[in-house]
Amino acid sequence: MDEKPGFMLIRTKSIAVKKPYIQVNPPLMTIYFVFDDDKENSALSWFDANLPAPLWTTQNADNGHCHHCYKLEIPLCTSEFASIKAIKYAQAVYYAYALKLGADLSYSQLITKNPLHPQWRTTYWT
């Protein structure tokens, strides 16, 4: 997503890392589970839900809304050559975490708040 809301542009990595929103997962691969938590002051929702600490949480300082990012131990292939069982298992885990967090179930995970951008309050938990 560029500075103007409503559209996304593919950028080189050197440019993308300077933007407020980034795509953390490459096409056809899931390395990170990202959860959109739109409750006020939701930085510790994972703790309140008795979930493991995410790798990082990026928080909007104005309203407290957060993105929680968990790095998978083993990246998940999502191409046509992937294991359907592995994909379904990962979806079940993601859904269970989203329910416990009270996260937005319609969030696509395509882009997330860039943890390196000064617009967000970022906490690295692990």
Identify the meaning behind each predicted range.
Residues 1-66, 72-88:
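Signature for HUH/AEP ssDNA processing cores
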Residues 63-69, 98-103:
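Short C-terminal domain-edge/linker segments immediately following a structured domain
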Residues 1, 6-13, 19, 38, ...:
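Catalytic "initiation/cleavage/transfer" segments centered on a nucleophilic residue
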